[in-house]
Amino acid sequence: MNLNYLLLLSINASIKAGKEIMNIYSTDFIVDNKKNDSPLTLADKKSNSIIELALKNTRIPYLSEEGKSITYEERKYWEYLWIIDPLDGTKEFVKRNGEFTVNIALIKNNKPIMGVIYVPCTN
């Protein structure tokens, strides 16, 4: 496993997702609510799709806040796992205060070994 390659892939995915988030940020976007009453926007969904597509070829499974739910029983023996929060701070995004990030982490044997935090508003 080439960690430098995976790091660059994660950085590029987060930047691309961040650009899409910022495209939506300047529009009159609609805010939906998830089952737990937390907000969900088109920016969450598009960012998630961009990141999932970018990481797909790594063949490492992923767990995303905006993706399907995977039980711990199903994933506890996975050697590697991506954890994605495609728009961390959706409430702040909705408030348009700039305090939100794109987060991607790589987990190996239940321990984080790499992470990317990208702040779209400040690049």
Where are these regions (language model features)?
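N-terminal subdomain of lithium-sensitive/metallo-dependent phosphomonoesterases centered on the IMPase/IPPase/PAP
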Residues: 1-87
